[in-house]
UniProtKB/Swiss-Prot annotation:
It comes from Streptococcus equi subsp. zooepidemicus (strain H70). Substrate binds at residues 21-23, 36, 59-62, 119, 157. GO terms for biological process: gluconeogenesis; glycolytic process. One of its GO terms (molecular function) is ADP binding. ATP binds at residues 208, 296, 327, 354-357. Keywords: ATP-binding, Cytoplasm, Glycolysis, Kinase, Nucleotide-binding, Transferase. It is found in: Cytoplasm. Belongs to the phosphoglycerate kinase family. Monomer. Its EC number is 2.7.2.3. Pathway: Carbohydrate degradation; glycolysis; pyruvate from D-glyceraldehyde 3-phosphate: step 2/5. It comes from the Bacteria. GO terms for cellular component: cytosol. This is Phosphoglycerate kinase.
Amino acid sequence: MAKLTVKDLDLKGKKVLVRVDFNVPLKNGVITNDNRISAALPTIKYIIEHGGRAILFSHLGRVKEEADKEGKSLAPVAKNLAEKLGQEVIFPGSTRGAELEAAIDALEDGQVLLVENTRFEDIDGKKESKNDPELGKYWASLGEGIFVNDAFGTAHRAHASNVGISANVEKAVAGFLLENEIAYIKEAVEAPERPFVAILGGSKVSDKIGVIENLLEKADKVLIGGGMTYTFYKAQGIEIGNSLCEEDKLDVAKSLLEKSNGKLILPVDSKEANAFADYTEVKVTEGEAVDAGFLGLDIGPKSIAKFDEALTGAKTVVWNGPMGVFENPDFQEGTIGVMDAIVKQPGVKSIIGGGDSAAAAINLGRADKFSWISTGGGASMELLEGKELPGLAALTEK
């Protein structure tokens, strides 16, 4: 990576501003999945072990008005992080002001402070999300010219807490998580060991047009599953019953198929049901066509076998988007089958592009079998699309 990283800095005795991604799910004030907190530990530990004073910034959820602050405080995160680090995490509970500034000034080497949810600044004019220059300058002033961005999950956004701070410090560098995310995903797409197979699922073609176009140029094969299958089917005149379809994207789907030179591989059967939720009948289609009154909710067994064959010998696999409604046990076989087909390839570099795919791997017990699971759905999608990420572009060149 051509950007400076945290290892390039002298941290001892310095107040180090760090953007992390602690946007974790909470239920009744309890964190239900703390993977993102764990993912930030190597960078935080490196800073404090090298005598730095870590000042952490993160958002949590969306906050547009005062009422949205309920249940969005980072207080539970501070507690969880303190347990993981085995030391106190100072939490003044504010995003600005005299109390926060005093707490930062009182920090000693090796201590950690967590600023309150950066999106609390969105209540008055969306200052965080719109990268308000004064807010970025203020947050930068809390440190000593050093900023570490370790929040890959927001690297595709130009916010005050990443791009704004970067613009107002002497050195803005990548943390270990951001460095690894870029290395795995970008290198997989730009310089893959071949054969390189991409697998794209999810419900909407519209979400992945740019990704499909980029990967058709870079990959040897692009496998399509999930709800967007049926837009591709209908574009070819195949019956789809009541399946999800983006009518306004039929021409796009047809165009992608025509210019794919056979690289784009679609399912050959589906698992269908007579309703999305309160269904009374589930069956496998004879072929591609979905029966009238039914909707496709997963790829079928012939498709799993076809995708297994397409993955044979693959050395690089990037997967983004489940093959079906994996949250329902009736429609998770396709996602499980494809995951198992990926991880059984000898010496394969297997990368999951965050979001629902990551949740599927974790929930279905396959997470530890993959080379890398991204912490950022939107950011990884933009990398797969070949876009430059604002949070990365703002960092200091080596």
